[in-house]
Amino acid sequence: MLRVGIGYDVHALVAGRPLILAGIDIPHEKGLLGHSDADVLTHTLMDALLGALALGDLGKHFPDTDERYRGISSMKLLEQVMKLLEERGYAIGNIDCIIAAQRPKLAPYIPQMRENLARALKTDLENVSVKATTTERLGFEGREEGISSQAIVCLVKV
């Protein structure tokens, strides 16, 4: 049996915060605002995984009102989501993610993002796609007010 999920997330860019994507601290003058480390890519992926399992969304499992999650690494939260997936007898078929950001250029970091996500998802690198794009200076991403991300996942029963 196959299950498919889609995820979407947005975080504002602000001064004084790190820019973390797939667990990588990317040098930039601004970072993402959020209760946790605000890793928009990993949040999107977790939302897609939870959706594929019909388990609700990220906020249901890790509410921003819970102090246990303040500043937490989203990669640690992804480990918890993977436990839910494994408990239900599913594994990753493949994932496809896209990040929309005007700056910084993310292409140099994509190989490490893929490796980090593949390791956390307990899957082969060939099952993990991460892409980055600009919005040609259009919208909030283009004005460098925030970064958005989308992901789709295919889960397989094992």
From Swiss-Prot:
Identify which top EC class this enzyme belongs to. lyase
Entry superkingdom: Bacteria
Instruction: Please give the Gene Ontology molecular function terms for this protein.
Output: 2-C-methyl-D-erythritol 2,4-cyclodiphosphate synthase activity; metal ion binding
InterPro entries named among the record's database cross-references: MECDP_synthase, MECDP_synthase_CS, MECDP_synthase_sf
The free-text cofactor remark is: Binds 1 divalent metal cation per subunit.
Reactions this protein catalyses: 4-CDP-2-C-methyl-D-erythritol 2-phosphate = 2-C-methyl-D-erythritol 2,4-cyclic diphosphate + CMP
| PROSITE patterns reported in the protein's UniProt record | ISPF
Q: What is its EC number?
A: 4.6.1.12
One matching Pfam family: YgbB
Amino acids binding 4-CDP-2-C-methyl-D-erythritol 2-phosphate: 9-11, 35-36, 57-59, 62-66, 133-136, 140, 143
Where do the annotations place a divalent metal cation binding?
A: 9, 11, 43
Single Gene Ontology BP annotation: terpenoid biosynthetic process
Q: What metabolic or biological pathway is this protein involved in? A: Isoprenoid biosynthesis; isopentenyl diphosphate biosynthesis via DXP pathway; isopentenyl diphosphate from 1-deoxy-D-xylulose 5-phosphate: step 4/6
Disulfide bonds, paired cysteine numbers: none
Tell me which UniProt keywords the record has, alphabetically.
Isoprene biosynthesis, Lyase, Metal-binding
Its cofactor is: a divalent metal cation
Site residues by UniProt (Transition state stabilizer): 35, 134
Assembly: Homotrimer.
**In UniProt terms, what function does this protein have?**
Involved in the biosynthesis of isopentenyl diphosphate (IPP) and dimethylallyl diphosphate (DMAPP), two major building blocks of isoprenoid compounds. Catalyzes the conversion of 4-diphosphocytidyl-2-C-methyl-D-erythritol 2-phosphate (CDP-ME2P) to 2-C-methyl-D-erythritol 2,4-cyclodiphosphate (ME-CPP) with a corresponding release of cytidine 5-monophosphate (CMP).
User: What is stated as this protein's family in its record?
Assistant: Belongs to the IspF family.
Protein name according to UniProt: 2-C-methyl-D-erythritol 2,4-cyclodiphosphate synthase
